């Protein structure tokens, strides 16, 4: 999959324009000289014109060389990369895709055992999406077009199930391709045929074909735009935000540039206020049609964004429901195996499926919110997407009550009727068999809790079960906020035969029961009281439980840090709290209406404005804030005889690192830091080789060579396996394929939170829960690292929506939610998997860009968690707020930039900033030298092919110029002699 980023194209033009201007000047001067020589004697005229032509040719050769070895060298390195994936490795990955799919699909309903459908049976498959299903998403998490996909119907056929060809032909004839949802523009059209097009003959044929029907409903999201919350606005065009771009042209802003072709469906697909995650009118009419003709109906929801499914209960004919996010390249093979009963489903939901998403606590605080009084912060530099020119915001007003943590707690407090509000709980899933779970007594040494859970298959077929361990902590009214259900750990059994049992041991650190008290103690606190530790079938239903009692409060402050921390976790994000009311459990969520209301003000306070930082406010005053007045100048250009390879395996704190860094020049440091777009740069002075880094969360794809891997299922589907082993296998497969592609860095896994169901990139992220997300991500990272591949955990942090993501998006949240919800997966990835690479995020945390937030990148990531490695920015576009000066001074090390721009290098070189550059270079070098790039068999890759080609072209050009010059001189002498004879 070869992709072209228009930001890069525009930047290339910008970077080479001076070279082109210089060549243009030479060209004009040469032409003027040629013109001036027109009246001279023939020999002299010809000679002057020949020399002018040769000057043009020489200038062209020089300019081409300067461009290739200068601003274009990085891009040429990227496009000339080598490496490919073997057929054997691709075949292994393909089968793993199928395994993940078949273990992640959730059997949500199975009345009258309608599933499995016996192999050899016939099935009517309704819904246009059955012929154009969702395989993944768009953007960095997209699949590689070089590999064929297995579609849904083929998956059924390969499992021995026949399907109605008349129906599938009807759908493909109606519309053969799925409308595109991209970063610059989104077509949200659902081309579901009008029910009037289903003829009586077609329905009669279907009933004669089979008495069972399957209906497929699909939703697709992608990078760059969230799913619409108002489809009627998309249809009438008011969803599109018009902007004037840098050329003065009007166009739709990327985030809100969605369209809908309602003429396909006779202009009646959505009612006012409908959103994208509910049935369209056409889909509802299709459900009516199918259920009025068939008594045995199976519904398949094919999408990673939790869909409103409350309508299912209104149709007694619907007896089976399957939840199946994007399956990757071949995963519908696994889907067919589940439907046919070849595999017993064991997936569990990774999100809560709410009956009414508009009643969710985040509904009013998700979307497009622009500050109205901050025009002085506007950036005319954001010309690639003019929507980014104005500061925006989002309020995480629900605090820690995200997903099931709200619904379970709100039900316990009497705020909601759980059965009316929740269709499928978090962690929910059925099986073709039945299980029991029995929990042992808890033992504790004061540091950890130990117990076991015995799972027994009490049904008639083999299957796997999931053990989910939750904590219901003691809560004091008005005290530290606590949800009544909190996932602590989980495990998946092996396949158990009927009557077979398996015992799983758990060790839970006592510190995992603590809550973050940002208001009083400013640290984690484990309050005295009874903690109910339970094994559940899902977040709502307890199977067995035990009580663990804490005798007195334990405060994890500076003098009593948590065992897992390098230094105590203390308040770092007071500045991100903002001036909003946060949802509280106090008095039964008495402030629910106030806290969850839409923002009352769109004005930025003077205090926030004074501290708001972008490229144009982070100037010398900002530098001074981040300066160390006592910093000493650095040593450069030393001759210590070290090369980077000599430091493989050397401890990060060893003094040899200082000796190596002393050898680097300022230019070396700038190159190392400034050019991290899909690579780390070569540094000749220390023998550092260039390494390749590749996207993305679902595969490993080189966007410059087009070489890539098999695409894996959406991360949500991986999360729905609830299998740490499969997550590890996924990372292992990515690492193996990356190694064959000569790739050392993987831009994944992504582990942001499904704060809402409408985030466009939910398919890239695992879950609404931090522990489930963290366990899956940590295992994937560990698997990749076994092949020497450094995995970039991303997007760090609070990057939970696409709308306005590069529009200086100020994300306001209290510290408890930041730590317990949004940072949790990253914390687990560092502590449990020893991750060594991070990709930060586009958004702001409060008033500070995440990539320039010292509290996040230095104090928490490196200080508290003990992270050793480097932090790379997200794509370093010209958005008006990303700058190496701020990033490097505050913990970012590498700019995700391929061609260079005005801000990807340090511009103010003080002792303090040079020390920061040196530290950034060390962080990068430490990670790279301990990666596969410095394994013996991968060193000495030789000269890049493009350089060999350039040298060859230079030799040819030199010979040509010499030959032409010789000919010109020879002809001049001949003409001169002829003129003299005359």
Show which residues each predicted segment covers.
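Glycoside hydrolase catalytic-domain context in secreted enzymes
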Residues: 1-518, 524-539, 561-982
């Amino acid at each position: 999959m070869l992709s072209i980023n228009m930001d890069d194209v525009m930047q290339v033009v910008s970077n080479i324009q001076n070279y082109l201007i210089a060549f243009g000047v030479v060209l004009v001067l040469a032409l003027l000289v040629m013109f001036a020589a027109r009246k001279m004697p023939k020999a002299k005229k010809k000679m002057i014109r020949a020399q002018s032509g040769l000057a043009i040719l020489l200038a062209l050769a020089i300019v081409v060389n300067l461009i290739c070895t200068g601003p274009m060298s990085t891009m040429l390195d990227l496009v000339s990369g080598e490496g490919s994936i073997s057929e054997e490795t691709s075949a292994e990955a393909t089968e793993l895709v199928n395994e993940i799919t078949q273990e992640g699909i959730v059997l949500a309903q199975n009345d009258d055992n309608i599933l499995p459908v016996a192999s050899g049976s016939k099935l009517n498959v309704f819904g246009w999406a059955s012929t154009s299903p969702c395989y993944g998403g768009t953007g960095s998490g997209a699949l590689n077009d070089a590999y064929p996909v297995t579609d849904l119907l083929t998956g059924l056929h390969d499992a021995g199930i026949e399907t109605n060809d008349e129906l599938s032909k009807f759908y493909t004839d109606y519309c053969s391709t799925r409308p595109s949802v991209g970063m610059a523009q989104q077509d949200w059209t659902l081309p579901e045929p009008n029910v009037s097009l289903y003829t009586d003959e077609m329905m009669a044929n279907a009933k004669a074909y089979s008495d069972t029907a399957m209906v497929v409903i699909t939703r697709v999201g992608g990078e760059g735009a969230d799913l619409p919350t108002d489809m009627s606005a998309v249809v009438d065009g008011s969803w599109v935000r018009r902007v004037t771009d840098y050329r003065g042209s009007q166009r739709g802003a990327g985030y809100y540039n969605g369209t809908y072709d309602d003429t396909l469906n006779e202009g009646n697909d959505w009612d006012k206020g409908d959103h994208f995650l509910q049935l369209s009118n056409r889909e509802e009419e299709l459900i009516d049609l199918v259920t009025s003709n068939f008594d045995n109906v199976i519904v398949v929801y094919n999408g990673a964004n939790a869909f409103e499914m409350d309508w299912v209960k209104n149709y007694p004919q619907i007896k089976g429901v399957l939840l199946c996010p994007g399956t990757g390249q071949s995963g519908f093979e696994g889907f067919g195996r589940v439907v046919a009963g070849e595999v017993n489903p064991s997936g569990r939901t990774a999100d809560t499926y709410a009956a009414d998403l508009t009643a969710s606590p985040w509904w009013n605080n998700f979307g497009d919110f622009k500050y109205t009084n901050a025009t002085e912060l506007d950036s005319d530099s954001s010309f690639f997407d003019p929507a980014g020119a104005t500061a925006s915001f989002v309020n995480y007003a629900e605090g820690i009550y995200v997903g099931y943590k709200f619904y379970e707690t709100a039900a316990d407090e009497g705020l909601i009727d759980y059965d009316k509000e929740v269709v499928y709980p978090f962690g929910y899933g059925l099986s073709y068999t039945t299980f029991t779970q029995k929990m042992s007594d808890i033992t504790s040494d004061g540091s950890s809790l130990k117990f076991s859970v015995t799972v027994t298959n009490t049904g008639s077929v083999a299957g796997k079960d999931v053990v989910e361990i939750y904590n219901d902590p003691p809560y004091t009214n008005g005290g530290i906020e606590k949800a009544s259900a909190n996932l602590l750990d989980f495990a998946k059994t092996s396949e158990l035969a009927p009557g077979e049992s398996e015992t799983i041991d758990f060790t839970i650190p006592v510190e995992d029961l603590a809550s973050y008290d940002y208001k009083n103690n400013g640290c984690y606190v484990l309050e005295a009281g009874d903690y109910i530790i339970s094994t559940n079938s899902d977040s709502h239903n307890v199977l067995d439980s035990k009580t663990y009692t804490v005798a007195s409060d334990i405060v994890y402050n500076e003098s009593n840090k948590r065992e897992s921390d390098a230094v105590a976790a203390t308040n770092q994000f007071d500045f991100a709290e903002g001036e909003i009311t946060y949802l509280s459990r106090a008095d039964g969520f008495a402030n629910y209406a106030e806290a969850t209301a839409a923002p009352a003000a769109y004005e930025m306070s003077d205090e926030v404005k004074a501290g708001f930082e972008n490229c144009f406010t982070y100037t010398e005053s900002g530098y001074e804030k981040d300066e160390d007045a006592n910093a000493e100048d650095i040593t450069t250009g030393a001759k210590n005889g070290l090369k980077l390879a000599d430091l493989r395996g050397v401890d990060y704190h060893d003094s040899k690192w200082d000796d190596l860094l002393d050898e680097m020049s300022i230019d070396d440091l700038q190159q190392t830091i400034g050019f991290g777009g899909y690579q780390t740069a070569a540094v000749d002075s220390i023998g550092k080789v260039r390494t390749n880094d590749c996207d993305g969360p679902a595969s490993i794809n080189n966007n410059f060579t087009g070489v890539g891997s098999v695409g894996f299922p959406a991360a949500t589907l991986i999360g729905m396996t609830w299998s740490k082993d499969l997550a590890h296998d996924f990372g292992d497969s990515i690492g193996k394929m990356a190694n064959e592609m000569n790739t050392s860095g993987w831009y994944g896994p992504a582990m942001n939170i499904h704060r809402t169901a409408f985030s466009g990139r939910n398919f890239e992220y695992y879950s609404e829960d931090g522990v489930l997300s963290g366990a899956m991500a940590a295992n994937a990272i560990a698997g990749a690292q076994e092949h020497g591949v450094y995995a970039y955990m991303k997007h760090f942090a609070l990057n939970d929506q696409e709308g306005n993501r590069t529009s200086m998006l100020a994300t306001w949240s209290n510290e408890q939610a930041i730590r317990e919800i949004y940072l949790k997966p990253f914390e687990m990835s560092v502590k449990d998997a020893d991750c060594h690479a991070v990709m930060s995020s586009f958004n702001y945390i409060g008033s500070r860009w995440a990539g320039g937030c010292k509290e996040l990148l230095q104090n928490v990531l490196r200080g508290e968690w003990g992270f050793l490695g480097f932090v790379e920015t997200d794509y370093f576009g010209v958005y008006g707020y990303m700058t190496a000066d701020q990033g490097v001074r505050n913990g970012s090390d590498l700019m995700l930039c391929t061609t260079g721009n005005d801000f990807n290098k340090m511009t103010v070189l003080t002792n303090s900033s040079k020390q920061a550059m040196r530290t950034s270079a060390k962080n990068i070098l430490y990670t790279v030298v301990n990666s596969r790039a410095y394994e013996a068999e991968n060193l000495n890759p030789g000269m890049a092919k493009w350089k060999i080609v350039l040298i060859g072209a230079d030799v040819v050009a030199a010979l040509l110029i010499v030959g032409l010059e010789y000919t010109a001189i020879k002809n001049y002498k001949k003409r001169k002699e002829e003129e003299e004879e005359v």
